[in-house]
UniProtKB/Swiss-Prot annotation:
PROSITE patterns: LCN_CSAB. Residues 1-20 form the signal peptide. It comes from the Eukaryota. Has the structural arrangement of an alpha-helix connected to antiparallel beta-sheets by disulfide bonds (CS-alpha/beta). The modification Cysteine amide is found at C82. One of its GO terms (cellular component) is extracellular region. Disulfide bonds join C31-C82, C35-C57, C43-C63, C47-C65. Expressed by the venom gland. Beta toxins bind voltage-independently at site-4 of sodium channels (Nav) and shift the voltage of activation toward more negative potentials thereby affecting sodium channel activation and promoting spontaneous and repetitive firing. It is found in: Secreted. It holds the Pfam family Toxin_3. This is Toxin To8. The keyword Metal-binding does not apply.
Length: 86
């Protein structure tokens, strides 16, 4: 029983360490990266260029990426700078 509990604990610990983030790619002006008029595989390519595992054009509007390294800045509603003057 002790080994089973230890195994489960290690399993959850590994899951937390390997976890990567996901979200919308950040464009040059602080907005989500637009994909409306881009080729079909544009978002998949852009996500792989920043180290993401996969990506797609969400609702034909913005690139959404999965398993992006922690060092990559993604668009966040809390820190949204899109359309704001500096």
């Amino acid at each position: 029983m002790t080994r089973f509990v230890l195994f489960i604990s290690c399993f959850f610990l590994i899951g937390m360490v390997v976890e990567c983030k996901e979200g919308y790619l950040l464009g040059s002006r602080g907005c989500k990266m637009n994909c409306l008029t881009r080729p079909e595989k544009f978002c998949e390519l852009e996500c792989s260029l920043v180290g993401g595992e996969n990506g797609y054009c969400a609702y034909w509007l913005a690139c959404y990426c999965y398993n992006v390294p922690e060092s990559v800045k993604l668009w966040e509603s809390d820190t949204n700078e899109c359309g704001k003057r500096k």
